[in-house]
Amino acid sequence: MRQITVFIVDDNKELRNALEEIVSMSEGYHCIGTASSAEEAVDRIPIVRPDVVLMDINLGTEESGIDVVKVLKPRIPDTNFMICTVYEEDEKIFEALSAGASGYILKKTPPGRMLEAIRELYEGGAPMSSQIARKVV
């Protein structure tokens, strides 16, 4: 089975490293890069062209993860973007999905479910944390 390549964007170094470790230690997944800012993400993601990008919304700068999705999705349409955030507000959810994100999960999602969500997104699904799905449907 082909490994799913994942790129992680989060301004929190500890969380970014934890997500990278979860992905890298799991069979069938490979973390091919990380970024801590919107600028770094916009520069690096089109070069490595991952299957899935885990994208935080708040990147500690004026540009958000949603802004990054808006810029990159038209440039690399085969890459799937999944928002991974603490925000549960309707406005953020719909803004992210409108920008081109295909999934939306909360950071409190257990690691096993997060990996399932990555695979589901890669296989054409639209994974969401249950709290988010209730707001969307």
Predicted regions: what is each one?
Residues 34-52:
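Acidic, metal-coordinating helix/loop segments flanking the phosphotransfer/catalytic sites
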Residues 11, 84-88, 107-109:
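Conserved active-site segment of CheY-like receiver
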Residues 56-58, 85:
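Active-site residues of response regulator receiver
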Residues 92-98, 108-137:
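Short, flexible helix-to-coil linker/hinge segments that flank and couple to helix-turn-helix
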Residues 2-15, 19-23:
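Conserved acidic segment of CheY-like receiver
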Residues 43, 66-78:
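Short amphipathic alpha-helix used as the core "switch/output" element in two-component signaling
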Residues 51, 58-60:
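The short loop immediately C-terminal to the conserved phospho-acceptor aspartate in CheY-like receiver
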